């Protein structure tokens, strides 16, 4: 099958660097490609098989070395660490259609001419933050892989073995490899050793990048959502000033249509002396589906008119028909854009909620075992650095989810405050009703949950961190 190149829009275009990296590291995302898909599918399946073979080798080492408690704990931590990568790799493959649907929600970024400047500005802010997040996470991942491989050459390459006959623990030399694994060949030296080393280096880089790139896409969705909420809050005050022109006398109505887009000094609407042809007013840029606008044109009574009996314009501010339609469509734009954001948040939760649940279940067990291992640190040696590295990396992964989930809660809950803080009392009756509805709808903050079991926020991170610290202190006291 050969896919022709297409022009991308919306979130797909914004997240294209992330998507290309995910495809490069073997993720099963074949929709946004050009050229033969069969080769990409074979490449993804080859990566999956190689990742699973190494993961099974790690699990085999865990099963074969259960005699010593310290060795068992260390091998369990390593297995759980790479469980994140395997589960997310398979999760993205199984739920690829959900990823496509979420990415496609914003494929038609319709805007309003009055607020186009504000929309473009917050979109550029979101794009810059998403690119910065991607670069930071990828650099951190590569540095972590380099550090992991480097520390392999320090210290003794041994493992603890428990002798049941003598009830003693002794050390056995093992291959100096980044990861303890069980292979069907002797990897102590020669070609098998070099092959095993290169294989594990590949496994480290690809598995960690596969997991982190999926997490970055999730966080990028939340970043984009938060900036859209910022845009909606930013245009609330100009929206109220616009609505006030419908039925409230204002001395300088011509100035009303200036600086309506977050401080812009550009004139947005010309105050024409005579009514323009209403056909010149194009509504296609403002959520132009028939379901949105058809009801209004079928029921003209929903639009107020200001013409007197003589057919003259009776609007107290002298607004033309075009300006009246523009003002009314601004309120509709805000509502439809907010509903669009709500749909995006719902799709994000459905797409990645189960992955968050699996991540937190694995991390809870892993962090508990790391707290136990941390009690045995007596010096800043290879063992101490390894445990600290595991601990910091695991907490950073959880923090990455929680910080963006918490920001979504803050931004969505502050929409009601922004609506109440604007000059709604100077607006039209329609605007006052609009603000009342906004306050009612935004009382409950938007959240992302882990398959309905927990809410992703800083409170979750504080709970996890508090549990780890508490367990660590208890173990120190028992020791």
UniProtKB/Swiss-Prot annotation:
One of the protein's GO biological processes: signal transduction
Q: How does it assemble?
A: Heterodimer with conventional odorant receptors (ORs).
Expressing tissues: Expressed in female antenna, maxillary palp and proboscis. Not detected in male tissues.
**Gene that this sequence comes from:** Orco
Q: How does it sit in the membrane?
A: Multi-pass membrane protein
Function per UniProt: Odorant coreceptor which complexes with conventional odorant receptors (ORs) to form odorant-sensing units, providing sensitive and prolonged odorant signaling and calcium permeability. Orco is a universal and integral part of the functional odorant receptor, involved in the dendritic localization of other olfactory receptors. Required for detecting a host for blood feeding. Plays a key role in preferred attraction of females for humans over non-human hosts for blood feeding.
The principal location of this protein is: membrane
Q: Where are the transmembrane segments?
A: 44-64, 74-94, 134-154, 188-208, 345-365, 384-404, 456-476
Subcellular location, in the record's words?
Answer: Cell membrane
* Deleted gene: phenotype: RNAi-mediated knockdown results in significantly lower blood feeding rate in female mosquitoes. Lack of sensitivity to all tested odors in antennae of female mosquitoes. Lower preference for humans as hosts for blood feeding.
* Highest taxon of source: Eukaryota
Q: Is the Membrane keyword given for this protein?
A: yes
* Single GO MF descriptor: olfactory receptor activity
Under which name does UniProt file this protein? Odorant receptor coreceptor
Membrane side Extracellular: which residues? 65-73, 155-187, 366-383, 477-479
Q: Which Pfam families does the record associate with it?
A: 7tm_6
């Amino acid at each position: 099958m050969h896919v022709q190149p297409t022009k991308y829009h919306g979130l797909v275009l914004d997240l294209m660097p992330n998507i290309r990296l995910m495809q490069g590291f073997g993720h099963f995302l074949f929709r946004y490609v050009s050229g033969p898909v069969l080769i990409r599918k074979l490449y993804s399946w080859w990566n999956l098989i190689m990742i699973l073979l190494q993961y099974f080798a790690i699990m085999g080492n865990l099963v074969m070395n259960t005699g010593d408690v310290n060795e068992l704990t260390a091998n369990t931590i390593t297995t759980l660490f790479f469980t994140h990568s395997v589960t997310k790799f398979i999760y993205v493959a199984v739920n690829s259609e959900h990823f496509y649907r979420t990415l496609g929600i914003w494929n038609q970024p319709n805007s309003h001419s009055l607020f186009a400047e504000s929309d473009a500005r917050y979109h550029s802010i979101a794009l810059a933050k998403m690119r910065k997040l991607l670069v930071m996470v990828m650099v951190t991942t590569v540095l972590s892989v380099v550090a992991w491989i480097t520390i392999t050459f320090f210290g003794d390459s041994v493992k603890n073995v428990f002798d049941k006959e003598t009830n003693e623990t002794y050390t056995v030399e093992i291959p100096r490899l980044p990861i303890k694994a069980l292979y069907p060949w002797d990897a102590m030296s020669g070609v098998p050793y070099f092959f095993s080393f290169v294989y594990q280096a590949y496994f480290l880089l690809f598995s960690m990048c596969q997991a982190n790139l999926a997490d970055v896409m999730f966080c990028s969705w939340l970043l984009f959502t938060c900036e859209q909420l910022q845009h909606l809050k930013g245009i609330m005050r100009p929206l109220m000033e616009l609505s006030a022109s419908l039925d409230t006398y204002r001395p300088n109505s011509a100035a009303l249509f200036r600086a309506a887009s977050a401080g812009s000094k550009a004139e947005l609407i010309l105050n024409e002396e005579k009514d323009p042809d209403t056909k010149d007013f194009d509504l296609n840029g403002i959520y132009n589906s028939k379901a949105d606008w058809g009801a209004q044109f079928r029921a003209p009574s929903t639009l107020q008119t200001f013409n007197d009996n003589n057919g003259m314009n009776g609007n107290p501010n002298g607004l033309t028909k075009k300006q009246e339609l523009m003002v009314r469509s601004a309120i509709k734009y805000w509502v439809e854009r907010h509903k669009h954001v709500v749909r995006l948040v719902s799709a994000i939760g459905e797409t990645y909620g189960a992955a968050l649940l699996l991540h937190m279940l694995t991390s809870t067990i892993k962090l508990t075992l790391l707290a136990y291992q941390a009690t045995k640190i007596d010096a800043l040696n290879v063992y101490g650095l390894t445990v600290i590295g595991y601990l910091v990396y695991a907490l950073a992964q959880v923090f990455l989810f929680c910080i963006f989930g918490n920001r979504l809660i803050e931004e969505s809950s502050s929409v009601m405050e922004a609506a109440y803080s604007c000059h709604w009392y100077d607006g039209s009756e329609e605007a006052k009703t609009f603000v009342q509805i906004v306050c009612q709808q935004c009382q409950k903050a938007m959240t992302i949950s882990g398959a309905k079991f927990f809410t992703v926020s800083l409170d979750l991170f504080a709970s996890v961190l508090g549990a780890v610290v508490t367990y660590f202190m208890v173990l120190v006291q028992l020791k």
